[in-house]
């Protein structure tokens, strides 16, 4: 599967929805917990530009109740 910025953005938005959050709630939580900007447009632009840093992805996952795990392909 070719990964594009649209699939990345949509994948992250889908995870937000599956965790029963709105984008605004995520932005508020990230602002309170980690000092992110409280601007929804900044967060949305970050997703569109694919400029989310790995540290920010970890913080986003934490707020959503997930963890990011690295595993080799083919492992269960």
Protein language model features and the residues they cover:
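Short amphipathic recognition helices of helix-turn-helix/homeodomain-type DNA-binding modules
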Residues: 71-76
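A short, Lys/Arg-rich alpha-helix, primarily the initiator
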Residues: 1-25, 29, 67
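Recognition helix of helix-turn-helix/homeodomain-like DNA-binding domains
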Residues: 33-52
